UniProtKB/Swiss-Prot annotation:
This is Homoserine O-acetyltransferase. CDD domains: GATase1_HTS. Belongs to the MetA family. It catalyses: L-homoserine + acetyl-CoA = O-acetyl-L-homoserine + CoA. The lineage of its organism: Bacteria, Bacillati, Bacillota, Clostridia, Eubacteriales. The keyword Protease does not apply. Transfers an acetyl group from acetyl-CoA to L-homoserine, forming acetyl-L-homoserine. The gene is metAA. It is found in: Cytoplasm. Its EC number is 2.3.1.31. The record marks S194 as: Important for substrate specificity. One of its GO terms (biological process) is L-methionine biosynthetic process from homoserine via O-succinyl-L-homoserine and cystathionine. Substrate binds at K163, S194, R251. One of its GO terms (cellular component) is cytoplasm. PANTHER family: HOMOSERINE O-SUCCINYLTRANSFERASE (PTHR20919:SF0).
Length: 306
């Protein structure tokens, strides 16, 4: 089934070249199908890149999905044109009276700043309140997960001695037969991480409403969920393209920053050799399981009932 996106969205050409079925909102109106309504709160600076990454994953399932792109109006984006935001994005004010089957809140490169000092955090709190009352299930990614754990459950982040950067092995630490989100997961799977902060396992375990579904011996908890399944927290970046960590590495090198080579990413740990992208199967399974089992099979048919 197709993913419904705004006309002329830059990601369209890339997705079509990858044989991902996309249609415009105008065409979708004439089809007698009730698509899943998904809001993507895109906090990443490279908006088009993140749009493409997420739409690729959402478009790889047999369910029609309609997308609304959301950005914080209280933040001035330096890496995207105002025209792009005006053409393709909405704000929380535009959607405050709507209901959504699902929402994705992305990461943001602000994890070394205190939450309350992030210029759009007050607006993000409004969005997170909205996600509780007007969204059936919300998937939070990296800093988005840390911000939500802080706001909803008073779990603060902790600065790491050095950046977690690379691709890391993870395992399931719960009976995966009882958790639909984990269906089909390998016993060991890989996920990219790129962050300066963490949420400690012991802090999560103090909250009875939360469960840790999967973690890494090297980088800690990875998938955390509320027991009702309506809040999912992902501490890594499964949506990343094969080249994203490489781009981040050379960006920091060119800025004169001290940055270690991303772990378990380049063959022989050598940036001059080919990279190893071994997380795409996991990423597709994670997003399809979330959409199928936590959104599609659970959300009411009528938006009013959400």
């Amino acid at each position: 089934m197709p993913i419904v996106i705004p006309k002329d969205l830059p990601a369209t050409e890339t997705l079509e070249n990858e044989n991902i079925f996309v249609i415009t909102e105008h065409r979708a109106i004439h089809q007698d199908i009730r698509p899943l309504k998904i809001a993507i709160v895109n906090l990443m600076p490279k908006k088009i890149e993140t749009e493409t990454q997420l739409l690729r994953l959402l478009g790889n399932i047999p369910i029609q999905v309609s997308i609304d792109l959301i950005h914080p109006k209280t933040h001035h984006s330096k890496n995207i044109s105002e025209k792009h935001l005006l053409s393709f994005y909405k704000t929380i004010d535009d959607i405050k009276n709507e209901k959504f089957d699902g929402m994705i809140i992305t990461g943001a490169p602000v994890e070394q700043i205190a939450f309350e000092d992030v210029d759009y955090f007050q607006e993000l709190k409004t969005i997170m309140d909205f996600s509780v009352t007007n969204v059936f299930s919300t998937l939070h990614i990296c800093w988005g997960a840390q911000a939500a754990l802080y706001y909803h459950y008073n779990i603060n982040k902790n600065i790491l001695p050095k950046k977690v950067f690379g691709v890391f092995s993870h395992h399931i630490n719960i009976n995966k037969g009882t958790v639909k989100l984990l269906r089909g997961f390998d016993d060991k799977f890989y996920v990219p991480h790129s962050r300066h902060t963490e949420v400690k396992k012991e802090d999560i375990e103090k909250v009875p409403e939360l469960e840790i579904f999967a973690e890494s011996n090297e980088v800690g908890p990875y998938i955390i969920a509320s027991k009702n399944g309506r809040q999912i927290f992902i501490t890594g970046h499964p949506e990343y393209d094969a080249n994203t960590l490489k781009s981040e590495y050379y960006r920091d090198i060119n800025l004169g920053k001290h940055i270690e080579i991303p772990k378990n990413y380049f063959k022989n740990n050598n940036p001059r050799e080919e990279l190893i992208a071994n997380w795409r199967g996991h990423a597709n399974l994670l997003f399809s399981n979330w959409l199928n089992y936590y959104v599609y099979q659970e959300t009411p048919y009528s938006y009013i009932s959400i």
